């Protein structure tokens, strides 16, 4: 069979270009972060500054395999071990290299539980990078899982951008978008609806235990 068909090759290359962020394996991220490209390193620092992580640079000690963030205080540079940073700062520093790479090259980046240990404002900032056409000039995409409710709003996402995972009767996970959900009158969920509030009310197929608790029922 001849697989050398232009459209198939193009699709294959697209899948190969996808970036899967794995916090358990930071080696690839380090290779990106410690690139010799000075302009790229400046972009990482600028992005950190944008979310109030006040660093002026960073340094990697190859001998001890340790990362240090640098801060300018009264004209002097002070260093802090990456391990001593807050969990939110560490996660942001770990995620930024692949996020910026995706934006720079127009790729898809996949991140599991992006909101974990991340302040809601930082999460919204990451999302805004991909939704801002002046920043995301090459059509990069972000696919992430989250339990965060603060971003489940019509001002942040369209209905077709929000997807739910629910267990069916065979204990299989099924996914469906908010756009697919129909109300009792067979109309779609309004694009101006309070998505977070309606989700907690169980209108989108909320977890049955959550629905029961919110209704004041017994759950133990």
Language-model region placement:
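Conserved D-loop-proximal element of ABC-family nucleotide-binding domains
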Residues: 116-120
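Hydrophobic "anchor" residues on beta-strands that sit immediately upstream
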Residues: 108-109
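C-terminal lobe/lid and adjacent interdomain/linker elements of RecA-like ASCE P-loop ATPase modules
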Residues: 71-73, 128-220
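Walker B catalytic acidic pair
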Residues: 112-114
